[in-house]
Amino acid sequence: MVGTTDEQTPSYADAHQPYARAPTIFETEFSSWTRERLVKGITDVLVDALGVDEDELTEGARLEADLGAESIDYLDILFRVEKEFGIEIPRGELFSINGVVFEDDAFRRVGGPSQNKIYVTEAGLAELKERLPHLNVDAFAADPDLALASDLHTVGSMVRFLEFRQQKIREMSGAESA
């Protein structure tokens, strides 16, 4: 960050602590939305951001491989999700696989026939599960080639992310879990 010192820059752990404030009125409303409403919102976001047809948006549709998302699209999708659902998404919570894996040497290893592939280690997989619980890391663990990691970002993982966010907001407000 420009103009900050290391002491001023929050760590990942600091930035991702449970909420220490009351939820906003928008967050409270969002926390009560049904799964169907979440799916509809994600559908609207992806149709607008990627120019795809609604019938392409199955739960398992991969953002890059199936829907044609490119790196710049992820930022657009993030902003549209925030606007659609009235929530703020801290940097790295929705799309941050590479950020997690490259943060620590213990989370990756080099391999392959020419030693030219990067694989996520067991420690890296565990870290991904903890930080990005909305992703299906177990399926990725069978072949943890980092080049395949973008396949973890699916329509379903985006809906699960919103469900996890709803749960955090309910916990923050003291409401009982659904």
What do these predicted regions represent?
Residues 2-79, 83-178:
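Phosphopantetheine-dependent thiolation modules in NRPS/PKS and related acyl-activating systems
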